[in-house]
């Protein structure tokens, strides 16, 4: 009796279209639904004129070369930089949420991966409620969404939003908050 140790029985062999498994509009749509948020007819038609590997390579290159969202003027402000902290901070957080939603939607694979890591390295805005930390956290997610995981974990662990979320301010060398 054969014992299967994994529920994933697929191989990691690259997909090569053939007559029984063609590179068609359904496969292209599926790819763009997984690695982006769908595609226009023009994009689908262009993808059909390329090999699957060329399309995937182009999507990865796009994610690697798409710049991070530029820092807003308030991205590294201290409390003393605010004129009216309550009003401005609320406005900046709302502004940033709109920008983050736009990034997720418009930056294809980079947007999807940033959103994925947002749900993996979770913080809670109510814990720190500070617009500059919100941007800085997002910037780390965008910077490292396709990069070295060890570097990513180190950077996200030192981010002010994450440190506050994890009560890092309660740590000391004699009494770590674990």
Task: Give residue spans per PLM region.
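Primarily short, surface-exposed interaction patches in extracytoplasmic proteins
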Residues: 39-57, 89-178
């Amino acid at each position: 009796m054969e014992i299967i140790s994994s529920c994933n029985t697929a191989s990691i062999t690259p997909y090569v279209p053939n007559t029984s498994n063609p590179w068609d509009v359904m496969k292209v749509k599926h790819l763009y639904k997984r690695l982006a948020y769908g595609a226009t007819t023009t994009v689908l038609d262009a993808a059909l004129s390329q090999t699957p590997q060329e399309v995937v390579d182009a999507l990865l290159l796009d994610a690697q070369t798409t710049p991070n969202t530029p820092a807003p003027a308030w991205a590294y402000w201290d409390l003393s930089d605010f004129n009216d902290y309550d009003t401005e901070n609320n406005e900046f957080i709302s502004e940033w949420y709109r920008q983050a939603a736009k990034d997720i939607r418009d930056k294809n694979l980079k947007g999807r991966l940033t959103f994925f890591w947002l749900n993996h390295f979770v913080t809670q805005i109510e814990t720190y409620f500070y617009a500059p930390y919100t941007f800085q956290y997002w910037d780390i997610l965008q910077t490292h969404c396709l990069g070295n995981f060890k570097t990513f974990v180190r950077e996200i662990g030192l981010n002010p939003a994450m440190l506050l979320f994890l009560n890092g301010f309660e740590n000391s060398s004699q009494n770590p908050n674990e």
